[in-house]
């Protein structure tokens, strides 16, 4: 464990995610003192010659008071209105706080749709790299004004994991109002903090849902553990801790929960396919094709397709489903949906003779495919 914590202290490029609950007052508004305390820690990291990207929630919380809202509204329209007003205030607060250290900030607003569109994905990566190279401090947020998934489900945790992979981070730090994952409700006596998670099997039997609840935000412990799973599977270790203990955690101290990296760093597009892409349709596979794709890691051929759903274009991400409707894989399809009816169930050799050599190929190549359920 000591070696793992030492690796935290030695990480050079770090993504830090902070939730609304760590930036707000008891009444739910933005707390300038808490923002300044976080910036003090982040600025010190930059001074130690580290590159840091901040993924920050808080736009909705910052917009509550200016709009006369006593608490986070439940209806989507007012949530988005609060986000629209609050995002500017949130960035202004960060700008003023970082100015104490002579550091400029750069705002990057993303949505799940941006991460799903490959061109946007590449541009976001280049922008973040350039901001870091030019000495600016990137502050990323889900675009709450239009990103309904984030507002409803607290998707900034997952966004942070994807950003960590996007910028090839050495470490992801998730800051919350709870000091790590506990084996029960941390407010009750007798519960213990889990110092490390070597693989997700270590959490079997742990009631993650009781280990922390967000107030003005939406991302509870469940979404944070899911974000840790995504990052760890992509080869990025994760520290989940309280914002109060951020400095100690980033220095490699024994605080929070450390998630060991469980996988190798994968190609950007594979993580994007598995966790960020929005499927534009589905291909239903027969039993033989399911075995070939899932167990044999083979490409999907027309002969193994039993049905087509949705209206997709060549190059779009689609789900591959078994006969029960379960999504077993996801991949980039090589044909438009309108072409599929004349292809399904037929051999590539037969299609090449009838339609030409362009049709003697896979519907989904194995290099453009990720398995969801082995």
Swiss-Prot record:
A GO term, aspect molecular function: ATP binding
Which Pfam families does its entry note? AA_kinase, PUA
GO cellular component terms, semicolon-separated: cytosol
GO terms under biological process: L-proline biosynthetic process; proline biosynthetic process
Domain of life the protein comes from: Bacteria
- Could you say which residues bind ATP here? 17, 176-177, 218-224
Q: Which residue numbers delimit the PUA domain?
A: 280-358
Query: Cross-referenced InterPro entries, in alphabetical order?
Result: AceGlu_kinase-like_sf, Asp/Glu/Uridylate_kinase, G5K_ProB, Glu/AcGlu_kinase, Glu_5kinase, Glu_5kinase/COase_Synthase, Glutamate_5-kinase_CS, PUA
Q: Which residues bind substrate?
A: 57, 144, 156
Zinc-finger is among the record's keywords:
no
Q: State which pathway it belongs to.
A: Amino-acid biosynthesis; L-proline biosynthesis; L-glutamate 5-semialdehyde from L-glutamate: step 1/2
Going by the UniProt record, its keywords in alphabetical order are: Amino-acid biosynthesis, ATP-binding, Cytoplasm, Kinase, Nucleotide-binding, Proline biosynthesis, Transferase
| CDD domains to which the protein is assigned, alphabetical | AAK_G5K_ProB, PUA_G5K
Q: What class of enzyme is it?
A: transferase
Reaction(s) catalysed (UniProt annotation): L-glutamate + ATP = L-glutamyl 5-phosphate + ADP
EC number in record: 2.7.2.11
Q: Where in the cell is it found?
A: Cytoplasm
Q: Its biological function?
A: Catalyzes the transfer of a phosphate group to glutamate to form L-glutamate 5-phosphate.
By sequence similarity, the record places it as follows: Belongs to the glutamate 5-kinase family.
Q: Per its record, how is this protein called by name? A: Glutamate 5-kinase
Q: Which gene encodes it?
A: proB
């Amino acid at each position: 464990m000591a070696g793992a914590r030492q690796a935290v202290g030695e990480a050079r490029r770090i993504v830090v995610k902070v939730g609304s609950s760590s930036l707000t007052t008891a009444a739910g508004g933005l707390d300038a003192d808490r923002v300044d305390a976080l910036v003090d820690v982040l600025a010190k990291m930059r001074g130690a010659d580290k590159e840091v990207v901040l993924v920050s929630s808080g736009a909705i919380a910052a917009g509550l008071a200016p709009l006369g809202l006593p608490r986070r509204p439940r209806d989507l329209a007012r949530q988005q209105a609060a986000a629209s007003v609050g995002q500017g205030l949130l960035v202004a607060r960060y700008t003023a706080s970082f100015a104490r250290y002579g550091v400029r900030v750069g705002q990057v607003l993303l949505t799940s749709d941006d991460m799903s569109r490959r061109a946007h994905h590449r541009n976001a990566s280049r922008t973040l790299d350039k901001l870091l190279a030019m000495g600016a401090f990137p502050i990323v947020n889900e675009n709450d004004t239009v990103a309904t998934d984030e507002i409803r489900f607290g998707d900034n945790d997952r966004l942070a994991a994807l950003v960590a992979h996007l910028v090839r981070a050495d470490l992801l730090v998730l800051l919350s109002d709870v000091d790590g994952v506990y084996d029960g409700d941390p407010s009750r006596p007798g519960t213990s903090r889990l110092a490390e998670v070597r693989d997700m099997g270590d959490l079997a039997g742990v009631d993650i849902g009781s280990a922390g609840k967000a107030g003005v935000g939406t991302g509870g412990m469940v979404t944070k553990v899911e974000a840790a799973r995504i990052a760890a599977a992509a080869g990025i270790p994760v520290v989940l801790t309280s914002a109060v203990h951020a400095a100690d955690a980033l220095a490699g101290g024994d605080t929070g929960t450390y998630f060991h990296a469980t996988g190798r760093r994968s190609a950007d597009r594979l993580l994007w396919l598995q966790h960020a892409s929005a499927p534009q349709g589905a291909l239903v596979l027969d039993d033989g094709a399911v075995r070939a794709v899932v167990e044999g890691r083979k490409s999907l051929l027309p002969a193994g397709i039993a049905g087509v759903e949705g209206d997709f274009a060549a190059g779009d991400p689609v789900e591959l489903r078994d006969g029960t409707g379960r999504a077993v894989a996801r991949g980039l399809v090589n044909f438009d949906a309108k072409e599929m009816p004349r292809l399904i169930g037929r051999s590539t050799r037969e299609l090449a003779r009838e339609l030409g050599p362009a049709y003697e190929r896979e519907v989904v190549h194995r290099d453009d495919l990720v398995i969801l359920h082995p």
